[in-house]
Amino acid sequence: MISKLISKLGYTRFIALSFIPVILLGTFLLCLPISSKTGEWTNFTDSLFTSVSATCVTGLIVFDTFTHWTVFGQIVILIMIQIGGLGLMTIITMISIFLRKKINMRERKMMMQSSGNTQIDGTLKLVKKIVGGTFIFEGIGAVLLAFRFCPQMGMLKGIYYSCFHAISAFCNAGFDLMGFRQPYSSLTYYTNDYYVNIIIMSLIVIGGIGFIVWNDILKNKFHFSKYLLHTKIVLVTTAILLVAGGLGFFIFEYNGELADKTVPQKIVNAMFMSVTTRTAGFNTIDLSNLSDSGTLLSLILMLIGGSPGSTAGGLKTTTIAVVVIAVFAMAKGGDDINTFKRRIVSDVVKQSAVIILIYLFAVMLSSMIICSVEGLGMSQVLFETASAAGTVGVSKGITNQISAISKIILMIMMYGGRIGGLSLVLVFGQRKPEAPVKRPTEQILIG
């Protein structure tokens, strides 16, 4: 059955569309009275928005997760986060392996593309490592968080909250249950808690660097020279973005949102902002009061997002890195684009440029429409749309105030951000075979 669907739809289209059944089932379950603390039906649009946000591991919400949803509803959201983080095809493959069902070549190729692997050999082993590694990291995170949550909340509630937030952080989802302290407060209660901050940050970063990078590090340990070019670019770019982002927030918010904190607290909160604005959606400070510089820095980091083959969305670290490397290569007057003693093929540069243009166009267009419909300021709306496109989930507090039309636009942005801009074009576009005769070239003026 699956093999026939793959053959008919193609790998990219099948992987992208595999999120839709999860979203629809989640929407139905969240609509039910059993999911709502009021015991009433939740309207379809808000249930769909929550389902899309959870499955696309974003974290934008129209209701406070603790205040509105029952434990049943919260678990439905958590399952969608886990499926969205791993990918439905990874889950299906693991079930097939567990049931000892034969996985044919077409399904293996599909899994290769879904997991981000470059070779079909070893794809099933990689899938096992992905699932095993995910549960190990989430388990370690839950145990560590339990040491803080259990004394504060009691044993059962502490364990439940530890598991929920560990999974949400590792999958870069940003959903939280801290509304019992104050609705929509996220992790602001723990703003000066170094222990919780470091654990959440670590889970977000590990989940956001990608499964291929894990596998490469596991295989080659800490021998950087032996890593794949992909791994080298991801690690270096991630490190630069974390440090630069943290430094930026430290400077821009020193006398702003971080003014009442000690220097060590400022550093930790600035680093947390640098981590979470790229992929996760948690916040330890009030984002509605960010300075203009801090808001602009957040927009940039949100659009960049995490790394390919990870639980994160956005443009991806490698996309930005390739374009930056290409710019420097062009400035030097060279024809080849080289880095780490390897040459990057021109097709990758073209695809990277296309992806950036797609994201920028989508964010600008959707922001203009929402501004027109809602009458809100551009800064707030840009923040929201960039958060949706990067599947980040941080907000300046307008998500629950906007109309159904604007929610639909944000849902499209979240879905596109999760599967990738180029994949979205390939899903709904019709690829035509190349013409047998190439047209003559002609120069045009640019720049």
Regions found by a protein language model. Name each.
Residues M1-G447:
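Membrane-proximal intracellular helices of multi-pass ion channels
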